[in-house]
């Protein structure tokens, strides 16, 4: 699945996918080369670079380029490769109680999770794009094309080691 959205910055388009694009926090292309078919997006006139995230990409446009024309070209290419775009909207982040007493930690990748075991485990769950760990709880945000219906059981199982309480209602 994929979807394209506008950002508040007119020189940026956001691509959302259900495919993991990188394990790095941000992987910039170039110098890296994205896998097919995203590599072909760099051939579209007006796209300067692509920043890959776990389940999405930021398409950075050249100043003065036509975002509407670029959007059309991106959509045409991705429809041929991946089929029609999804209209799914992002589910809100959820909070889960955890036995953590340290300082606030934010991670958007396994790399950012460092050696913190709760954060590392959460990034083993498909769909997780951000986790914010604070004393007593962790906020978990999913990629736009994932739903809590699909992912919640895996998050609970990950946090379900003995001693982990139930979900805190937002």
Features from the language model and the residues they span:
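A generic structural motif
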Residues: 13, 55-62, 136-143
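Compact, charge-rich alpha-helical regulatory domains located at protein termini
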Residues: 9, 24-34, 45, 126-127, ...
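Short acidic amphipathic segments
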Residues: 38-56, 119-137
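N-proximal, solvent-exposed amphipathic alpha-helical segments enriched in charged/polar residues
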Residues: 29-36, 108-124
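Short glycine-/aliphatic-rich beta-strand segments at the starts of folded cytosolic domains
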Residues: 5-28, 90-110
């Amino acid at each position: 699945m994929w979807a394209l959205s506008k950002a508040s910055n007119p020189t940026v388009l956001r691509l959302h996918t259900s495919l993991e694009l990188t394990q790095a926090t941000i992987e910039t292309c170039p110098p890296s080369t994205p896998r097919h078919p995203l590599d072909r997006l760099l051939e579209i006139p007006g796209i300067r670079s692509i920043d890959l995230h776990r389940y999405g990409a930021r398409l950075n446009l050249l100043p003065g380029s036509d975002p509407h024309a670029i959007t059309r070209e991106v959509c045409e290419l991705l429809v041929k490769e991946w089929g029609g775009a999804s209209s799914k909207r992002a589910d809100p982040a959820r909070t889960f109680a955890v036995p953590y007493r340290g300082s606030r930690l934010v991670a958007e990748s396994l790399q950012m999770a460092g050696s913190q075991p709760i954060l590392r485990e959460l990034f083993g769950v498909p769909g997780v794009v951000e986790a914010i760990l604070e004393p007593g709880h962790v906020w978990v945000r999913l990629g736009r094309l994932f739903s809590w219906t699909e992912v919640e059981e895996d998050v609970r199982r990950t946090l379900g080691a003995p001693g982990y309480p139930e979900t805190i209602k937002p």
